[in-house]
Amino acid sequence: MNTPKRLLFVTLVASAALLPAVNAGPETALTGPVERYISIDNACAWPNLTVLPDGTIIAAIFNRPSHGQEAGSIEAWASQDGRFWEKRGVVAPHEPDTNRMHVAAGLAQNGDLVMLSTGFTNLQQPGQSKKLPFRDRLLPPWVCRSSDGGRTWTHTNSFPSPPEGFGPFLVFGDIKAGADGALHASAYAQKDDDPEKEDRAWHFRSDDDGRTWRIISVIGTGHNETALLHLEGKRWLAAARTIGPQQVDLFRSNDDGTTWAGPEHVSEAKQIPADLARLADGRLLLTYGTRVADQRGVLGKLSSDEGKTWSAPIRLADSLSSRDCGYPSSIQRPDGKIVTAYYSAGVGDHTRYHMGVVIWTPPSSPPTP
């Protein structure tokens, strides 16, 4: 598939003094040097970052400048440090009059990249009226795999079908390995003909290094996009987006995802969805978008007790010009700096969709709420 040539725009912010808080609430600005980049231009992106064994950072992105309402594919882009990026391959090429716009991504135990991808068809379905562009029917997930760092990919239809009465699964978040080497992922689905539009978030497990998957449990009812993080042993943390207030709830499992306890609210309304990461010093990092008017951007929180308590929000991205923004994904470089990627429909004078990146140093003593 031919894609528009992308231009790279770079902005380096030398001091957090240039990053004022956007409201009078408890959130704080970053301290120390901060780098900001418009890294991949003219793409809605919804980035998901994965670090390869050789240290290369891979961003899985949706490659079109639309909120999923035109034909497009999931691509893999590569960077050595999070600053500059180049296209490496097409993870999930779309078929005619369809798109592949959703992705879950991670590493297999053998070092392969494993991604799951879903999308929509634009073809009117039998017995139904025509829906909005590229919203006629959700396509079942593909299982995508690359053994050469994201350059070439294979695809299978080996992801499980949803339980009877539910529509196809829609994937999200990271694919993580547990203590026993099994891979774990999340996806959500909606009841057919449900007037309440009540999503359920499921937990999945693969015992063959990501080649086939099976349903393990429901994480939350009334929740959809869910990030997973392995803590230790059989303990897991999940950060799930709610349907109603549009906030992030935490769930916990002590039995490798067989059962989940929660929810615990961890963000305010219109602050979604989330990403979870473990830092080198043992702390947890939660990053999430905020679509609150006059506060749009990306926030982060740190936890020193496995997610039981969290710091006050730290402002990572600011002045995004539309509520069409957020979906952060974060990794930590060997030098300790955090690379947080996110998407935005525009910022300041730059009015195109893009993947933005902020490179920052986590504070040693984060602010208390």
Q: Where are the predicted features?
A:
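Bacterial N-terminal signal peptides
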Residues: 9-18
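Asp-box/BNR beta-propeller blade signature and adjacent active/binding-site loops
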Residues: 21-369
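N-terminal secretory signal peptides that target proteins for export/translocation
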Residues: 1-4
